[in-house]
Amino acid sequence: MTDNAILLGEGFTLMFLGMGFVLVFLLLLIFAIRGMSLAVNRLFSEPPAAPKPAPAAVAPADDFARLKPAIVAAIHHHRRLHP
């Protein structure tokens, strides 16, 4: 083998070793963060929120009674502008 082939082989070896160490480090980091998240959630859990009372339902007739004059005025305005 020539010196270039040996250097290329060592370069690939170092590259794969470096990539392997980075991969292992990132996987350990992921598991450590997940573990810390579980620990924090277990130690400092939020109290359950009290259910909010449901708003009273408004009668649809009441809504229509309030909107009817506005609808009539809008139709009248439209018909006046576009004969």
UniProtKB/Swiss-Prot annotation:
EC numbers: 7.2.4.2
Assigned keywords, A-Z: Cell membrane, Ion transport, Membrane, Sodium, Sodium transport, Translocase, Transmembrane, Transmembrane helix, Transport
Stored Pfam families: OAD_gamma
GO cellular component: plasma membrane
Keyword Ribonucleoprotein applies: no
Protein name stated in the entry: Probable oxaloacetate decarboxylase gamma chain
Gene: oadG
Domain of life (superkingdom): Bacteria
InterPro entries: Na_pump_deCOase, OadG
Catalyzed reactions per annotation: oxaloacetate + 2 Na(+)(in) + H(+) = pyruvate + 2 Na(+)(out) + CO2
Quaternary data: Heterotrimer of an alpha, a beta and a gamma subunit.
Cofactor(s) in the UniProt record: Na(+)
Lineage: Bacteria, Pseudomonadati, Pseudomonadota, Gammaproteobacteria, Enterobacterales
Function text: Catalyzes the decarboxylation of oxaloacetate coupled to Na(+) translocation.
Annotated GO MF terms: decarboxylation-driven active transmembrane transporter activity; oxaloacetate decarboxylase activity; sodium ion transmembrane transporter activity
Family listed: Belongs to the OadG family.
Chief localisation class: membrane
A Gene Ontology biological process term: sodium ion export across plasma membrane
NCBIfam families recorded: oadG_fam (TIGR01195), PRK02919.1 (NF002792)
Transmembrane segments: 13-33
